[in-house]
C-alpha cells in the first residue's frame, strides 16, 4: 500500500534565499486574490461558479494584470488556482449543509475571503518542476540555484517524490517535501498480545500489557520543563513588548516559539519511536490508546497545571504513533477513556459510571483496590483503557508488576 508522508525544512529570515521566497509568496497571494475576484464576481452577478479550467484560461490571457505569468512556473500558478477551487468547493458544501442544519451555524457561511494585501500565500511546486539529481532536489532556474538535500531518499520503502510546498510563517518559511512510501498492505495478525497506553503529563505515556511484563512509563517531565520555560519567557517578553513598543509579538518571541515547537516535536518523535520499537521488539501487534477529546477544555485543574497540559500536543503524539505503527503494520486502536481513572482493574470492574470512585486514587499517584492492594494509578488507568477494547482481559499475574513501572527517558 502506498501512503503519503511529509518531510519539513525550515527557512529562516537570515537565509540568503528568504527574500526570494517572500517575493514568490507575495505573487502567489496576488494570483489567489485576482482569481478569487473573478470567481466572486461571476457568482455574485450571474450566480455561476467559475471553475478551474475557465480561471486558468482567463488569467493566462490577461495582459494587463499578469499575475499568472509572474509566478515562478506555470504549474505553480495552476496549483494556486486548484487551491482556490478547493476553497470554493468547501464554501458550497458548507452552504448545502447550512440549508439543512442552520442550528449548527452562527450565520450563513461567507464567501472565500481575499488574502491580506501585504500578506503571503503558499507556493506549490510539483515533481514536473523539481527534479532529483544525485540525491539532491534541484529547483527551476527561477529559484536562482536553490537546492535541498532530502532525507526521504534514504528510506528503504521510498517510492516517489510528489511536490514541494513553501508555507509562509512569521519571518520564516516551512518547506514541506511530500513523498510516497510503501507500507504493508495488511496489518500484522492479532496474536493476542496487546499494549495499552494512558497519556498524561508527568507520565507522557504509561504503557501496560496483557502478558504480565512490567509496565513502562515514558517520562513527560522533559516536555513540561520545555513548556514551563517557554510560557514564562513569552509572558515576560509580551509584557515588555507591550510596554515599550505597544507590540503583541516580536522577533524574540517568534524565535522562542520556533525553538519550543522544534524541541517538543523532537521529543514527541523520540517518544513515539520508542513505543513502536518496544512493541515490535516484544511482539505486541496491537496498541490501544486512550483518547480524551476534552483535554484542552479541562477545567478542574489548577491554572499552573492546566497551562502545561494545554501546551503539550497530546494528539500530535497519537498521530505520530499512528503513522509509525502503519509503517510497521501494527494496529492502533483509539478509545475514549471515561471512568478509567476511578475504576479498579484489580477488582475486575468495568470502566463505567456506576463503578466510578475517584477517592480510591490516593496521594503519590497510587490507586488502592477494594482489597487494599496498591497499584500505580496511571497503570490502573492504562489497564482499564485496555479493558474498554478487550473486556475479557483480567488481572491474573498483574498485581506483582503494577506497583512500580519502569520509567524511561527519551530525551
What are these language model-derived features?
Residues 35, 80-91, 377-389:
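Stable alpha-helical structural segments in soluble proteins, enriched in small hydrophobic residues
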Amino acid at each position: 500500500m502506498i501512503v503519503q508522508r511529509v518531510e519539513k525544512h525550515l527557512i529562516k529570515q537570515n537565509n540568503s534565499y528568504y527574500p526570494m521566497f517572500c517575493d514568490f509568496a507575495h505573487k502567489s497571494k496576488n494570483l489567489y486574490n485576482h482569481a478569487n475576484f473573478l470567481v466572486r464576481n461571476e457568482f455574485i452577478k450571474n450566480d455561476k461558479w467559475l471553475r478551474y479550467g475557465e480561471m486558468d484560461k482567463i488569467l493566462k490571457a490577461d495582459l494587463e494584470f499578469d499575475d499568472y505569468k509572474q509566478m515562478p512556473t506555470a504549474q505553480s500558478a495552476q496549483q494556486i488556482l486548484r487551491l482556490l477551487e478547493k476553497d470554493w468547493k468547501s464554501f458550497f458544501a458548507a452552504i448545502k449543509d447550512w440549508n439543512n442544519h442552520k442550528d449548527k451555524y452562527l450565520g450563513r457561511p461567507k464567501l472565500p475571503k481575499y488574502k491580506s494585501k501585504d500578506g503571503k500565500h503558499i507556493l506549490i511546486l510539483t515533481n514536473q518542476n523539481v527534479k532529483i539529481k544525485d540525491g539532491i532536489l534541484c529547483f527551476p532556474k527561477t529559484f536562482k540555484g536553490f537546492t535541498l538535500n532530502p532525507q526521504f531518499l534514504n528510506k528503504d520503502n521510498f517510492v516517489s517524490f510528489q511536490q514541494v510546498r513553501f508555507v509562509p510563517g512569521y519571518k520564516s518559511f516551512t518547506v514541506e517535501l511530500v513523498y510516497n512510501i510503501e507500507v504493508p498492505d495488511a496489518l500484522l495478525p492479532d496474536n493476542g498480545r496487546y499494549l495499552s497506553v494512558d497519556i498524561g503529563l508527568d507520565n507522557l505515556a504509561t504503557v501496560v500489557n496483557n502478558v504480565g511484563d512490567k509496565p513502562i512509563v515514558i517520562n513527560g517531565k522533559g516536555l513540561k520543563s520545555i513548556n514551563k520555560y517557554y510560557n514564562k519567557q513569552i509572558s515576560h517578553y509580551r509584557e515588555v513588548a507591550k510596554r515599550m513598543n505597544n507590540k503583541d509579538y516580536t522577533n524574540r518571541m517568534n524565535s522562542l516559539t520556533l525553538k519550543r515547537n522544534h524541541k517538543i516535536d523532537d521529543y514527541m518523535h523520540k517518544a513515539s519511536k520508542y513505543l513502536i520499537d518496544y512493541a515490535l521488539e516484544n511482539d505486541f501487534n496491537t496498541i490501544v490508546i486512550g483518547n480524551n477529546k476534552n483535554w484542552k477544555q479541562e477545567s478542574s485543574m489548577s491554572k499552573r497545571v492546566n497551562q502545561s497540559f494545554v501546551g503539550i500536543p497530546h494528539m500530535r503524539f497519537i498521530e505520530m504513533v499512528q503513522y509509525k505503527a502503519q509503517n510497521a503494520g501494527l494496529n492502533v486502536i483509539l478509545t475514549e477513556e471515561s471512568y478509567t481513572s476511578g475504576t479498579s482493574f484489580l477488582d475486575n470492574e468495568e470502566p463505567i459510571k456506576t463503578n466510578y470512585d475517584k477517592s480510591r486514587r490516593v496521594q503519590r499517584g497510587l490507586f488502592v483496590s477494594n482489597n487494599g492492594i496498591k497499584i500505580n494509578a496511571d497503570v490502573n488507568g492504562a489497564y482499564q483503557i485496555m479493558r474498554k477494547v478487550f473486556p475479557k482481559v483480567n488481572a491474573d499475574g498483574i498485581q506483582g508488576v503494577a506497583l512500580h513501572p519502569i520509567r524511561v527517558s527519551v530525551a
